[in-house]
Amino acid sequence: MKITAKAWAKTNLHLGVGPAHDDGFHELMTVFQTIDLFDTVTLTTLDEELVEEGSVVKQLSVTGARGVPEDASNLAWRAVDALVKRRAEKTPLSAVSLHISKGIPVAGGMAGGSADAAATLRAVDAWIGPFGEDTLLEVAAELGSDVPFCLLGGTMRGTGRGEQLVDMLTRGKLHWVVAAMAHGLSTPEVFKKHDELNPESHMDISDLSAALLTGNTAEVGQWLHNDLTSAALSLRPELRSVLQEGIRSGAHAGIVSGSGPTTVFLCESEHKAQDVKEALIDAGQVYAAYTATGPAASTADQRGAHILTVS
């Protein structure tokens, strides 16, 4: 059996970072949105090999990006193991291989690893499920703070560690430019720097919520915010000039996506987004740039991680 699932990249229209709890995680107030960059995960059963104990994953390969782990530390591999453990029946299973095709910038603050985990959960559910949406979301939250959102997609408010999700009403599509850097940033490193700098927390999203309801791109751009910006700029000062170039070339607003170093720029139209993308590339400050729209997908069954093919 071969199952391919797809999951979208995410960006944060707002990321407010509160104090750290005893477990080291910070209280967050965030607004997630999927954008139509994506990864796919293909799970293939190796029917000639049955596994009675230990991981059923025997191989993991990655194309489209360098530096992604191809071992049990990969979040997709861990997603298989975590969901397999939830089976009621403990009979032997076929071994499986995983292949990840990357279209989301790696270590860029766009939840590429979390998207892979979410797509993998959908694939395993199609293989040996159904487990039910509640179980999938529970396992997703165990795997990482962004995985539940990647499973569900759309535009959502996230609180707690980002895993407590509520749908948000939006109007129309937003046009984005995604500017990727050659080297990623470690999320724990960014949060550590944030704690050192200790900037003011911004936990109020009421103005952004109202702007999203209008569908007015300029209004939405006015309320984009990320509390991790100062930390990301401290670790990667060159991001400041990337943000300046995006605004100079016509974007309404630009912010660091998540923990960075990817930056995203909100534009008035697809045409303007193309202009901003070309200006960023011509300036020679970014590794790659893409245009995208959000929220991704036009149908409800494709708004989050979803199955593409089963054969």
Curated annotation (Swiss-Prot):
Pathway(s) the chain acts in: Isoprenoid biosynthesis; isopentenyl diphosphate biosynthesis via DXP pathway; isopentenyl diphosphate from 1-deoxy-D-xylulose 5-phosphate: step 3/6
GO biological process, one term: terpenoid biosynthetic process
GO molecular function, one term: 4-(cytidine 5'-diphospho)-2-C-methyl-D-erythritol kinase activity
SUPFAM superfamilies documented for this protein: GHMP Kinase, C-terminal domain, Ribosomal protein S5 domain 2-like
Catalytic activity: 4-CDP-2-C-methyl-D-erythritol + ATP = 4-CDP-2-C-methyl-D-erythritol 2-phosphate + ADP + H(+)
Short name of any one Pfam family annotated for the protein: GHMP_kinases_C
EC number from the UniProt entry: 2.7.1.148
Gene3D superfamilies reported for this sequence: 3.30.230.10, GHMP kinase, C-terminal domain (3.30.70.890)
Keyword Kinase: yes
Active site (catalytic residues): 10, 146
Superkingdom of origin: Bacteria
The keyword DNA-binding appears for this protein: no
Record keywords, A-Z: ATP-binding, Isoprene biosynthesis, Kinase, Nucleotide-binding, Transferase
Top class in the EC scheme: transferase
Residues binding ATP, per UniProt: 105-115
Similarity section: Belongs to the GHMP kinase family. IspE subfamily.
Described function: Catalyzes the phosphorylation of the position 2 hydroxy group of 4-diphosphocytidyl-2C-methyl-D-erythritol.
Name under which the protein is recorded: 4-diphosphocytidyl-2-C-methyl-D-erythritol kinase
Annotated source species: Corynebacterium glutamicum (strain ATCC 13032 / DSM 20300 / JCM 1318 / BCRC 11384 / CCUG 27702 / LMG 3730 / NBRC 12168 / NCIMB 10025 / NRRL B-2784 / 534)
Species lineage: Bacteria, Bacillati, Actinomycetota, Actinomycetes, Mycobacteriales
Gene from which the chain derives: ispE
